Amino acid sequence: MAVTITLKTLQQQTFKIRMEPDETVKVLKEKIEAEKGRDAFPVAGQKLIYAGKILSDDVPIRDYRIDEKNFVVVMVTKAKTSPGTSVPSEASPTATPESSTSFPSAPASGMSHPPPTAREDKSPSEESAPTTSPESVSGSVPSSGSGGREEDAASTLVTGSEYETMLTEIMSMGYERERVVAALRASYNNPHRAVEYLLTGIPGSPEPEHGSVQESQVSEQPSTEAGENPLEFLRDQPQFQNMRQVIQQNPALLPALLQQLGQENPQLLQQISRHQEQFIQMLNEPPGELVDISDVEGEVGAIGEEAPQMNYIQVTPQEKEAIERLKALGFPESLVIQAYFACEKNENLAANFLLSQNFDDE
């Protein structure tokens, strides 16, 4: 039975595509290209995001269990056509999705990226960068081709009320507000760049001095051999196994669990952010025996550590009032809290989520 996929772009354009459940994500991309045009939506440049996850080309649509009431975000990355030697380096991230594996070097090179006021003066010297170290430049997107980025910013820059709308829109992909704000800041409020940074890593750590030493120690150790999964050590940890099973049962809980992990073990969260593809692949591995979310909440903070800790969620008075209003709809407190934090403390989204879950159960 055919399903209708609702798609939304970063410019708030919404359209629908009819798909057979057996058809793959690649077919969906081809249909998007056919409907919207190869110039605007080339298959090779499309990234489809649902519930904070990038959809893989060879996976059937039915495997992602896309709710027709929700939407899939379409992000298009285009090769820059600006003259000069910066063209090959700008085209490489879009032509080869695997280029994200070179991003562990991005924090080191990204820390020297020019401030906003110096963009125009820096562009000539920036264009010569690929001749010295093309590998690091392709990994550190903002430090190359700043002229091309200014063109992007001129056409897609968001400010004022549009900024808040865009912020909410990107958060709906499953990212924390703080990370979205940081990505928008690093991209000079260019939403395309911001989403790209969230997917591949935000260049330039907000804590360059004391944070860079710890990050280099974390990243150097696992990346000594090419092709090795730096997150392999998580596979044998029961806390991660339980977390994986819960996420597969309800992908909407991933942002809340990652937020909790960031509070308990920020270094591990940084490492996961640098290796999102491997982490998502591990999350998508076949689960074992099903577990309950209540068994996982207290274990998330213990991932990467030897012993679990007790974890408590702190809420403000306003957040408590929002939770009470959601409970008044007739849902149990435990389910309300899960939905509220899974929806990044957005009361309306949480209410819609709870109502849709209730409808599905009936």
UniProtKB/Swiss-Prot annotation:
Keyword Nucleus tagged: yes
Keywords, ordered alphabetically: DNA damage, DNA repair, Isopeptide bond, Nucleus, Phosphoprotein, Proteasome, Repeat, Ubl conjugation
The UBA domain, residue ranges: 161-201, 317-357
Role according to the record: Multiubiquitin chain receptor involved in modulation of proteasomal degradation. Binds to 'Lys-48'-linked polyubiquitin chains in a length-dependent manner and with a lower affinity to 'Lys-63'-linked polyubiquitin chains. Proposed to be capable to bind simultaneously to the 26S proteasome and to polyubiquitinated substrates and to deliver ubiquitinated proteins to the proteasome. Involved in nucleotide excision repair and is thought to be functional equivalent for RAD23B in global genome nucleotide excision repair (GG-NER) by association with XPC. In vitro, XPC:RAD23A dimer has NER activity. Can stabilize XPC.
Comment on protein domains: The ubiquitin-like (UBL) and the UBA (ubiquitin-associated) domains interact intramolecularly in a highly dynamic manner, as each UBA domain competes for an overlapping UBL domain surface. Binding of ubiquitin or proteasome subunit PSMD4 disrupt the UBL-UBA domain interactions and drive RAD23A in to an open conformation.
Quaternary structure and partners: Interacts with XPC; the interaction is suggesting the existence of a functional equivalent variant XPC complex. Interacts with PSMD4 and PSMC5. Interacts with ATXN3. Interacts with UBQLN2.
Record's protein name: UV excision repair protein RAD23 homolog A
Organism: Bos taurus (Bovine)
